[in-house]
């Protein structure tokens, strides 16, 4: 709310100072991942640092996403949900904790995939993915549903695969 108020009052320098102060020390390596897309960089670097702090190996492959034709809000929903789920699954994993992430534009397509170690199979309820979270069971798989809705909005396709020790979510969206 404070940032919003500063921006509405056109207090841009104060907003930048405020954000800088509250985020100081939030993560050490601000630009470990650079896609040339500010929103994507912010999410990926934040989640990368979170994973590293939780002793999760985070392997990534990205390229220049500066010309991506997706709304920022949609990018946030997809990336935040996929990476939050991957980090949570790895945290609960016994043994190796690894996230492999790919987000690239190639051959007139957006390709995004997340593969992570896990300890359990996907739970389905009424042909939909159900959450394993103990918090608010009424929100079964809301994040995944939102991802699928956005993929369909852009006429894309997705694949979800799972076995006892790995989860894989892949998205292809035509440019």
Locate the predicted segments by residue.
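Conserved ATP-binding N-box helix of the HATPase_c
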Residues: 72-95
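Short beta-strand/loop element within the Bergerat-fold HATPase_c
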Residues: 96-108
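Short beta-to-alpha transition helix within the HATPase_c
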Residues: 17-24, 36-53
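Glycine-rich nucleotide-binding loop
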Residues: 120, 163-170
